[in-house]
């Protein structure tokens, strides 16, 4: 699968809010309710003020503040990176642009099925399916020394509306990342992935416990309270000494 390397910085503009307002008319009651909540969301407003591409940036900012996931000099693989908000945070925290001359310079690689607008300090591989073996090989080629210190994932499958099916798909995506870690994640590294609470959550947690020394469930304030979304933070990767899926 062909990917596109994006290195040039462009002004960061939040377009979603403007687009939503322009198309407010002609929506259903449920859509009006969602849009009203969206426009009142303090994290949406803060993202616009601080030039983050979407509100999810504040999830990573909070988790990083509490758990020190990112630091200057680290190599980061951001899976499900579009529209690029997590990559923005990662670029800042690992000093990927070299803005701080007194600190090590890190690296950020973002991968997504969707197009991502260029961001200074980040390399984007898109459109690309992280589960495709060809994408995997391209990731290895792009990562410095073919390794990442941190794997971030805010990925989610296209929703079917069938909760159990969507949950199963997301768990499968997360397990794919754990499988990839054997060849990508540096020993001692970190994996942070989004999941939805459900019947198979324990399978993912069990696998992470086998592969990492420490695993915890995190629910940042920016995650909506009514959402089943949680993040699994696994640290101190054992280096593939756990049990790989058949």
From Swiss-Prot:
<dbReference type="InterPro" id="IPR050082">
    <property type="entry name" value="RNA_methyltr_RlmE"/>
</dbReference>
<keyword id="KW-0808">Transferase</keyword>
<keyword id="KW-0949">S-adenosyl-L-methionine</keyword>
<dbReference type="GO" id="GO:0031167">
    <property type="term" value="P:rRNA methylation"/>
</dbReference>
<feature type="binding site">
    <location>
        <begin position="83"/>
        <end position="86"/>
    </location>
    <ligand>
        <name>S-adenosyl-L-methionine</name>
    </ligand>
</feature>
<protein>
    <recommendedName>
        <fullName>rRNA methyltransferase 2, mitochondrial</fullName>
        <ecNumber>2.1.1.-</ecNumber>
    </recommendedName>
</protein>
<comment type="function">
    <text>S-adenosyl-L-methionine-dependent 2'-O-ribose methyltransferase that catalyzes the formation of 2'-O-methyluridine at position 1369 (Um1369) in the 16S mitochondrial large subunit ribosomal RNA (mtLSU rRNA), a universally conserved modification in the peptidyl transferase domain of the mtLSU rRNA. This activity may require prior 2'-O-methylguanosine modification at position 1370 (Gm1370) by MRM3. Essential for late-stage assembly of mtLSU required for efficient translation of mitochondrial DNA encoded proteins; methyltransferase activity is not required for this function.</text>
</comment>
<feature type="binding site">
    <location>
        <position position="112"/>
    </location>
    <ligand>
        <name>S-adenosyl-L-methionine</name>
    </ligand>
</feature>
<dbReference type="GO" id="GO:0005739">
    <property type="term" value="C:mitochondrion"/>
</dbReference>
<dbReference type="GO" id="GO:0006364">
    <property type="term" value="P:rRNA processing"/>
</dbReference>
<dbReference type="GO" id="GO:1902775">
    <property type="term" value="P:mitochondrial large ribosomal subunit assembly"/>
</dbReference>
<dbReference type="InterPro" id="IPR015507">
    <property type="entry name" value="rRNA-MeTfrase_E"/>
</dbReference>
<dbReference type="Pfam" id="PF01728">
    <property type="entry name" value="FtsJ"/>
</dbReference>
<keyword id="KW-0489">Methyltransferase</keyword>
<dbReference type="GO" id="GO:0008650">
    <property type="term" value="F:rRNA (uridine-2'-O-)-methyltransferase activity"/>
</dbReference>
<feature type="transit peptide" description="Mitochondrion">
    <location>
        <begin position="1"/>
        <end position="24"/>
    </location>
</feature>
<dbReference type="GO" id="GO:0005730">
    <property type="term" value="C:nucleolus"/>
</dbReference>
<keyword id="KW-0698">rRNA processing</keyword>
<dbReference type="GO" id="GO:0005759">
    <property type="term" value="C:mitochondrial matrix"/>
</dbReference>
<feature type="binding site">
    <location>
        <position position="154"/>
    </location>
    <ligand>
        <name>S-adenosyl-L-methionine</name>
    </ligand>
</feature>
<keyword id="KW-0809">Transit peptide</keyword>
<keyword id="KW-0496">Mitochondrion</keyword>
<feature type="binding site">
    <location>
        <begin position="129"/>
        <end position="130"/>
    </location>
    <ligand>
        <name>S-adenosyl-L-methionine</name>
    </ligand>
</feature>
<dbReference type="InterPro" id="IPR029063">
    <property type="entry name" value="SAM-dependent_MTases_sf"/>
</dbReference>
<feature type="active site" description="Proton acceptor">
    <location>
        <position position="194"/>
    </location>
</feature>
<dbReference type="InterPro" id="IPR002877">
    <property type="entry name" value="RNA_MeTrfase_FtsJ_dom"/>
</dbReference>
<comment type="similarity">
    <text>Belongs to the class I-like SAM-binding methyltransferase superfamily. RNA methyltransferase RlmE family.</text>
</comment>
């Amino acid at each position: 699968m062909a990917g596109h390397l994006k290195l040039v910085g462009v002004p960061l503009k939040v377009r979603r809010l403007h687009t939503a307002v322009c198309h407010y008319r002609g929506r259903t009651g449920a859509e009006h309710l969602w849009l009203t909540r969206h426009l009142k969301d303090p994290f949406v407003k803060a993202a616009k003020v601080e030039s983050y591409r979407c509100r999810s940036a504040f999830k990573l900012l909070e988790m990083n503040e509490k758990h020190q996931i990112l630091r200057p000099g680290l190599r980061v693989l951001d899976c499900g990176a579009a529209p690029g908000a997590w990559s923005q945070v990662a670029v800042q925290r690992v000093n990927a642009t070299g803005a701080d001359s007194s600190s090590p310079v890190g690296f950020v690689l973002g991968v997504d099925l969707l197009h991502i607008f260029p961001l200074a300090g980040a390399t984007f591989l898109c459109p690309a399916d992280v589960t495709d073996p060809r994408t995997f090989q391209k990731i290895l080629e792009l990562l410095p020394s073919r390794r990442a210190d941190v794997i971030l994932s805010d990925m989610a499958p296209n929703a079917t509306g069938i909760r159990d099916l969507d949950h199963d798909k997301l768990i499968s995506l997360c397990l794919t990342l754990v499988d990839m870690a054997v060849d990508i994640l540096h020993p001692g590294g970190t994996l942070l992935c989004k999941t939805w609470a459900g019947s198979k959550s324990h399978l993912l947690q069990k696998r992470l416990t086998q592969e990492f020394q420490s695993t915890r469930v995190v629910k940042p304030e920016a995650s909506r309270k009514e959402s089943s979304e949680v993040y699994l933070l696994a640290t101190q990767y054992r280096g593939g000494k756990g049990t790989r899926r058949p």
